[in-house]
Amino acid sequence: MDMAGHEVNSSSSSSGAESSSSSSGRQQYKKRPAGRTKFRETRHPVYRGVRRRGGAGRWVCEVRVPGKRGARLWLGTYVTAEAAARAHDAAMIALRGGAGGGGAACLNFQDSAWLLAVPPAAPSDLAGVRRAATEAVAGFLQRNKTTNGASVAEAMDEATSGVSAPPPLANNAGSSETPGPSSIDGTADTAAGAALDMFELDFFGEMDYDTYYASLAEGLLMEPPPAATALWDNGDEGADIALWSY
């Protein structure tokens, strides 16, 4: 009886160990979910058929070909999203048979119907559609660049023509004109001449230089006059001498 109970307990414990090991194995090797784990949105939020390409900030254009399931038409890479959107409009106009063929509803810009010169092309000739779209976009960008350059040049001409010379400043005497460089130089020359005239004084009166130097020579040859008698020779030493006598 005891042996039978012991066998039952051992079998139940072994089955419990096997079930726990199998459950731990299932938890360890859990199956990964299928599908993409990371999705990066590159489509432009506004323009149709435009998406970003790479980290350089360039934009590509790709449109669906109407009437062909899964067919797409590659239109190239552009610097700006607006240019890629214009390429999309040009391709849709060409594929729809012109601006009045129902392609105006799929345009990114409504003015592309008359700004883009796109000839109608057959949807089967995708190479011709691509060529017509790229030529139309290139012509539009060239015209837009020329127009913007001309407007900028006109604005620059107007700005420069409106600039005039500043009015002359009034001097302290109330005159409306300031003396020019020539008048300033003339005033300086006049002042310098007056200063020189101040030093050219007539020290000798009617006497010329020859007579003046001759008189100096005669003065050197003459004997000097006798010296005046000193006061202490009069014998009045120690006496008070009045400076003034009335």
Swiss-Prot record:
The alphabetized UniProt keywords are: Activator, DNA-binding, Nucleus, Stress response, Transcription, Transcription regulation
Q: Superkingdom of this entry's organism?
A: Eukaryota
Q: Which InterPro entries match?
A: AP2/ERF_dom, AP2/ERF_dom_sf, DNA-bd_dom_sf, DRE1A-I
Return the SMART domains for the record: AP2 (SM00380)
Whereabouts does the entry annotate DNA binding, in residue ranges?
46-110
User: Which Pfam families would you find in this protein's record?
Assistant: AP2
Q: Where is the composition biased (Basic residues)?
A: 28-37
**Role summary:** Transcriptional activator that binds specifically to the DNA sequence 5'-[AG]CCGAC-3'. Binding to the C-repeat/DRE element mediates high salinity- and dehydration-inducible transcription.
Q: What protein is this chain from?
A: Dehydration-responsive element-binding protein 1H
State the species of origin.
Answer: Oryza sativa subsp. indica (Rice)
- List the top taxonomic levels of the source: Eukaryota, Viridiplantae, Streptophyta, Embryophyta, Tracheophyta
Q: Which gene encodes it?
A: DREB1H
